[in-house]
């Protein structure tokens, strides 16, 4: 109907859709001209990324997080601080990677739980640090007392009493589900974490989209936004090579070209005669830019400055002519001219 806005259905959460959203966000952050301009666009993009991750998280963990948001009452009363420790069953499952399961790739799983429960979730205790050498160095120091305890998950929240209890209850339920190992090959959460890690590292490949669609380079887009670039010719089309100028001049001659002297015609005093121009002798009828040395200006070295004058006075410029002396020129003296030799 006229006047009604068409509402498009949201795309289903999938790894391919999440990869496209992350690529668009990376593109926006890589272009300096777009940073801070489209504020609402960046906010909507972040909200869509969080929605897709949440739905994928729910589907992969079989209802790990309730799809309904927390229903919190109005904040009444003072702010309280609550904390809870959930110990990890490392003795029952010594080879299971609970820390990686709780934190996720680059801490995304823990951040997802924090955003949905409103609690702070941290892994503490022995073997909670990736660098074992650094863990041994910090053991016994102030603020590192938790390294003497068994591996556990620390959940903290700050809110009014009623709201804090609701948040803590939800967080404890979700973390307890993470502490139950899944069978090998049936851990959907692990599959999702590996997929997210591949997307973040740029190694994830979409199997449903054709290769030309995936051939999208962020570096090329950033370079195109900063300045012009050369456009390559389409495959199969090669530009013809530029033809060279023929060596013979074309067009009406403007001035005569000096031909080389002939040694056979020499005057008695040794001066060679000039060869008369022939009909085909001419010059090039074209612009001087094709032959850069044809009409080159006289070099300054051909005008030596006389240094005998006073400093600051005008110097006399003397033109230097490079006349070629004939190698077989005969010098005729007065006595030889009289005798005829």
From Swiss-Prot:
Record key words, sorted: Cytoplasm, Developmental protein, Differentiation, mRNA processing, mRNA splicing, mRNA transport, Nucleus, RNA-binding, SH3-binding, Translation regulation, Transport
GO CC, alphabetical: cytoplasm; nucleus
Keyword Glycosyltransferase tagged: no
Subcellular localization, as worded in the UniProt entry: Cytoplasm; Nucleus
Chain positions of motif SH3-binding: 276-279
Coiled-coil regions, chain positions: none
GO MF, one example: mRNA binding
Record carries keyword Nucleus: yes
CDD domains in alphabetical order: KH-I_Hqk
Location (main, coarse): cytoplasm
Domain KH: 87-153
One GO process term, biological-process aspect: spliceosome-depend formation of circular RNA
Domain of life, source organism: Eukaryota
Pfam families with a match to the protein in the record: KH-I_KHDC4-BBP (PF22675), Quaking_NLS (PF16551), STAR_dimer (PF16544)
Positions of short motif Nuclear localization signal: 324-330
InterPro entries: BBP-like, KH_1_KHDC4/BBP-like, KH_dom, KH_dom_type_1_sf, Quaking_NLS, STAR_dimer
Task of the protein: RNA reader protein, which recognizes and binds specific RNAs, thereby regulating RNA metabolic processes, such as pre-mRNA splicing, circular RNA (circRNA) formation, mRNA export, mRNA stability and/or translation. Involved in various cellular processes, such as mRNA storage into stress granules, apoptosis, interferon response, glial cell fate and development. Binds to the 5'-NACUAAY-N(1,20)-UAAY-3' RNA core sequence. Acts as a mRNA modification reader that specifically recognizes and binds mRNA transcripts modified by internal N(7)-methylguanine (m7G).
Family annotation (PANTHER family): PROTEIN QUAKING-A (PTHR11208:SF131), RNA-BINDING PROTEIN RELATED (PTHR11208)
SUBUNIT field: Homodimer; does not require RNA to homodimerize.
Family, similarity comment: Belongs to the quaking family.
Protein name per UniProt: Protein quaking-A
Gene giving rise to this polypeptide: qkia
